[in-house]
Curated annotation (Swiss-Prot):
Biological source species: Histophilus somni (strain 129Pt)
Descriptive protein name: Small ribosomal subunit biogenesis GTPase RsgA
Binding residues for Zn(2+): 298, 303, 305, 311
UniProt keywords, alphabetically: Cytoplasm, GTP-binding, Hydrolase, Metal-binding, Nucleotide-binding, Ribosome biogenesis, RNA-binding, rRNA-binding, Zinc
Binding site for GTP: 162-165, 216-224
Pfam families (UniProt xref): RsgA_GTPase
Residue ranges of every copy of the CP-type G domain listed in the record: 106-274
Cytoplasm as UniProt keyword: yes
EC number: 3.6.1.-
InterPro entries: G_CP_dom, NA-bd_OB-fold, P-loop_NTPase, Ribosome_biogen_GTPase_RsgA, RsgA_GTPase_dom
PROSITE patterns linked to this entry: ENGC_GTPASE (PS50936), G_CP (PS51721)
Amino acid sequence: MSKRKLTQNQQRRIQSNNAKTLHRHQHRHKSDIDWQDDMLGDFQDGTVVTRYAVHADVENEQGEIVRCNLRRTLKSVVVGDRVVWRKGKEQLQGVRGVIEAVQPRHNQIVRPDYYDGLKSIAANIDRIIIVSAVLPNLSLNIIDRYLVVCESSNIPAVIVVNKADLLSSEARTEVSLQLEIYQKIGYETLLISAKSGENMDKLTALLSEGTSIFVGQSGVGKSSLINYILPEVNAQTGKLSQVSGLGQHTTTSSRLYHLSQGGNLIDSPGIREFGLWHLDREQITNGYREFQYFLGTCKFRDCKHLHDPGCAIQLAVKEGKIDPLRFENYHRLITSLSETKSQRHFISAN
């Protein structure tokens, strides 16, 4: 009797589990330091400024950064977390402290992971900077995906379009018209160029208050923006793949930077596909802020806002109160949700 052929999902799951087992084995000696009370100093507050696979860098109130282990009881520790930690009396295997607890988060950004459920990216954010680029083309669908995440996380968003120096006058006009779609519904937008410096002063001023995070696909120029804003950091920049047009991942760990003019900036690894599997139809619908005024006024309570009679959203589109491109992207998201929704239960990222 021949063996049943594994599906692609089953093969990926086996490969992922195997990789995780190898990773745990390879790093077991690094992460399993048994810190005893007599090896540690007093409890103190700190902020996670870098998160690695098995360690985290914590900054104390005096600005000192210490590499720490994590207590095994901690479910999730991400950049931006306020933590309670203790400094070791000596350095062990390159580690000088241990994180004991994570303070309650004001907010967090999460994304679904097929194998690990909901995965936190960063915590305690004041604004999300959605970075897009004009090449290969400006994707409003991707921008809308990020905006749904921002709205569901209740975190203000700013749309930044990089590489404006590559635009012809005609293309610049087209991009400006696309950005007006978002300006009309209350989103702040910036058309910038890290290469020419266009509008970089406005971006720098925006970042000077609170903690911001750059999100966006690889290759949109997040590292180039950081090099401009923080030249001393010299973040590694990558070249676009000439074959696919997709960028190479150049940031391997999430990091928090302090800006000289004030404010903090978090840079996270680029993500080519920002899944929304953990959100249901109602959450995605609520992620479109211009829909809010019309929701609840459709003829039928279970209106899907597609071909339903008496749909207030469709009427608003026809009357020019909702942009048709946004409405089209909304249904693309709903369709993709129906096609790719995993049956697994997404556990909390806390």
